[in-house]
A protein has these predicted regions:
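Short aromatic/hydrophobic "clamp" motif used to bind/position activated sugar donors
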Residues: 116
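The conserved acidic donor/metal-binding loop of glycosyltransferases
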Residues: 120-125
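Acidic donor-binding segment of Leloir-type glycosyltransferases
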Residues: 54-93
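Conserved donor NDP-sugar-binding/catalytic core segment of glycosyltransferases
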Residues: 128-161
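Glycine-rich, basic loop-to-helix element that forms the pyrophosphate-binding segment
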Residues: 94-111
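Cell-envelope/extracellular polymer assembly enzymes that use nucleotide-activated donors
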Residues: 35-38, 68, 200
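Conserved nucleotide-sugar donor-binding catalytic segment
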Residues: 167-260
Length: 369
């Protein structure tokens, strides 16, 4: 049976859906020794992204019989029809629009996995996303959480890949998280947080942590329906944690042709014709975004001012150092002249004696210094 088409609610365009079977045929019990994994995805009016998200899930190389996919949907354009055919999916829909922190806590309560791994609905995740995270946590038994403090972000408007991070050994953005169930006995998200929720969950980045390979974890494509316009991150670039990376291109991480087509060519027109995804409908989220933006702007302005003052001090110090250097050079020259003059004075006195010149007519140091 060929792929079916489904209308995109709100824009009248059609979108092909991935209807293949998400079951890996294996002998019963063959993979029981592997940790059971709960994939968690919160979503709000992101219908255009779900074909891509499903393909990412389908391409994971971790055994599907050791996975479940928890989806919490509080959007007005529910995606139940797009995911209900997937055996691993546990879909939960809510009419109440929630903050991201509350949605993540709610997802956790629905999971049964030994390891919980995040898959955001609008980012690309490589096939080894799950297996790499599981292997890394297994190899680091003291770590409760894994993630990547380095994230690659491709900005189409300037055709440039940027490397963000690293920010610290215990830091990562939530979209890269993978953690043991044990962690949920120690922490939870702030229900009222919609942005920057990671800091609370990781207790100020003090949770025992291990870093993941960013190339095996996530690739981010900014788009017009982001709650925060990621292009604004470039205002103060380059800086120590935000730099272009000419050695990494999209194909280095993303090798699925149809997903590449979606992100590189199709996405802009699709989102322009999908009004439900407009960030203006996230009223409470936007309030928090505005507060964070203001704080970030103030912080970056203080950083800029500090750098400017440091540069001015450096310039002043250089001027003083150069002046001191010139003074020392001139002093050295003067001393050398004085030494030479004294030598000449001694010679002159010797000649004076030979010539019988009277002392009152002789040269003195005052004549030559």
């Amino acid at each position: 049976m060929g792929p079916k088409k489904k209308k995109i609610s709100g824009n009248g365009q059609s979108q092909k859906l991935n209807k293949q079977i998400h079951i890996t045929p294996v002998r019963p019990g063959l993979n029981d020794h592997l940790p059971f994994v709960s994939i968690c995805t919160p979503t709000f009016n992101r219908r255009p992204f779900w074909e891509m998200a499903i393909k990412c899930f389908d391409e994971y190389d971790y055994p599907k019989d050791r996975m479940e996919w928890i989806i919490v949907d509080d959007g007005t354009d529910k995606v139940e029809d797009l995911v209900s055919h997937i055996p691993q999916v546990k879909y939960h829909k809510y009419d109440e629009q929630m903050m991201l922190g509350k949605k993540r806590n709610l997802m956790h309560a629905k999971t049964r996995g030994d390891i919980i791994i995040y898959q955001d609905d609008d980012d690309y995740y490589p096939p080894d996303r799950v297996s790499h995270a599981v292997q890394t946590l297994t190899a680091n038994p003291t770590a409760l959480c894994a993630g990547s403090s380095i994230v690659f972000v491709y900005f189409k408007h300037i055709t440039q890949m940027y490397r963000f991070g690293p920010y610290g050994p215990n830091h990562a953005t939530a979209g890269t998280f993978a953690f043991r169930r044990e962690l949920l006995r120690q922490t939870r998200y702030d229900d009222n947080k919609a942005i920057g929720e990671e800091r609370d969950f990781l207790k100020g980045y003090t949770i025992p942590f291990v870093q993941l390979d960013p190339m095996k974890t996530i690739l981010v494509f900014p788009h017009i329906h982001n709650s925060c316009d990621k292009r604004e991150l470039l205002v103060y670039a380059p800086n120590p944690t935000c730099n272009p990376d000419p050695d990494i291109n999209v194909n280095t991480i993303l090798r699925n042709e149809s997903i590449y087509q979606f992100f590189m060519k199709d996405i802009d027109d699709i989102l322009q014709n999908y009004p439900p995804g407009d960030p203006k409908y996230k009223v409470e989220v936007n309030k928090q975004v505005a507060v964070v933006k203001e704080a970030n702007t103030k912080r970056m302005e203080e950083h800029r001012k500090k750098k400017q003052e440091e540069a001015q001090r450096a310039d002043t110090n250089k001027i003083v150092d150069d002046a001191n250097k010139r003074v020392q050079e001139e002093r050295g020259k003067a001393i050398r002249v004085m030494v030479q003059n004294k030598k000449l004075l001694i010679k002159l006195r010797e000649y004076e004696k030979l010539l019988g010149i009277e002392p009152e007519h002789a040269f003195t140091e005052e004549h030559v210094v």
